[in-house]
Amino acid sequence: MGVVAKQSFYNILSVMLAFGIGAINTIVFYPRAMGEELYGIVVILLAQSNILQPIFSYGVQHTMIKYLSAAPSQKEQDKLLLFSLLIPLVFILPTAVLFFANYTEIAAYLSTKNPEIAQFIYLIFLIAVSTAYFEIFYNWARVQKQTVIGNFLKEVYQRVLITLLLLAYLLNWIDFSAFINALIVGYYLRLAVIMGYSLWLYTPKVYFSFPANTRQLLTYSTLIFLSASGASVIIDIDASMLGKLVEDRYVAYYRVAIFIAAIIDAPVRAMLQIVSPLVSEAINANKQEELKSLLSKSGTNLLLVSGLFFVLINANINDLYDFIYFLSGKDGFVEAIPVVLYISITKIITAATGCTNNIVNNSKYYYFVPFLSIGSAIAVVFLNLHFIEQLGFIGAAFATLIVITAFNIIKVLIVGMTFKILPFSKQTLYLVLLILGHYYLFSSLDFPFSAFVNLLLKSSLICGSYLAFCVGLKISPTINDLLATAYKKLRSILG
């Protein structure tokens, strides 16, 4: 099993475990322990923090991936690593002064619809600092071709942390204020672990000078910062805008729906952790055939696996929400079923593009990205204002679908016109037909059992049929090899 397949496999396991724990948090503990209003407050605070984080990191984690393999010497690589640690301080320190000097005004602005938020907005700044440096040290490990530990910390750790804190809150061991403070401490413990791990993998020598190509690094970081800020707005602006435009409970409904649909994104997040450094190396070494292979394989494999998740979620959506009602005792969540479908379509389109985004970001055409991201961010804000007014909180998901689809189409066109390669092939057509066929077939199939039994039964049928078609049509040799390896290991275990 190659480095991409092996680490992607372990990363997918981490992501799926994270989603399982997150599902328990989102569906059971948050509604029962805190209720919809306090849960909505946590969602809004973390969403605001995620918007601030790209400003603090200033794109240096992506600069590290793009330029480390192109550095002419170990000394220049070490300087680049230290550069990546120092640049964020240029933005964090002044922001800290402005944030806390104007704390009252910022709190008043952010809490117009939700007054309870005002006393906790310090979380926004502190979590943003922690996540900014976490991403830098995590990418430090990624350029050493080690993604599994960092991915576990990124995906699983924080959800286990929240589970423990919610249990403590449910048992009245802590109040909401202590929950917020403990959450911050937990994020900084995670930062300490990834810092220690990345330095254990490789500790750079300290040089009291910046890299020779500092101007080039700053230019790239600035453009990626603008791009990441726009992308962060697209991802997190929904929760932030909904927090000002609708009641807290609708933010909670929306968040649960987003969480469900995000499961489709698990393979993308897992595979691209290791693919991104490989893309950068292929571009820096001008290995066109290797780049073409990475794009083609990532597009096919991600669409195959994400397509299975798409069918599992959306063909089971009614039983899934019945099960959520059984666990949470809250019947309002079902109002967000259309959100699941809209965001699911967004995720499946993104999966089909493979590592297109990584190619654009790591190529000489990266200067297109900030304009696309900022344009998309502006578009999603205006579309949110329009569609939330017309469709309620569901309108935010529809706006996201429109913007992300357009964003992906443009990036595919950029790669197609500049590198003369595309993530699509005849396998893409087979997969689209397979996904649509299974979705429509199993959506109309109902069993007269409990929601839990229906989920197990229908999911088993979907997996068996979908994977049988994929193997029979030989859509992906990589997936076929993984399934064959898993089958052999299972047979050896069972004797």
What are these regions (language model features)?
Residues 1-4, 116, 176-182, 192-235, ...:
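Interhelical loop/hinge segments that connect adjacent transmembrane helices in multipass membrane
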Residues 3-62, 91-96, 100, 127, ...:
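Signature of the first transmembrane helix
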Residues 443-495:
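Membrane-proximal transmembrane or re-entrant/amphipathic helices at the cytosolic face
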Residues 103-124, 313-347:
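Interfacial segments at transmembrane-helix termini and the short loops linking adjacent helices
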Residues 7-23, 182-190, 194-198, 211-281, ...:
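Transmembrane helical elements of multi-pass membrane transporters/channels
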Residues 153-200, 374-379, 393-414, 437, ...:
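Hydrophobic alpha-helical transmembrane segments
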Residues 130-156, 341-375, 415-417:
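Membrane-interface junctions at transmembrane-helix termini in multi-pass inner-membrane proteins
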Residues 56-72, 143, 257, 261-299, ...:
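Helix-loop junctions and terminal segments of transmembrane helices
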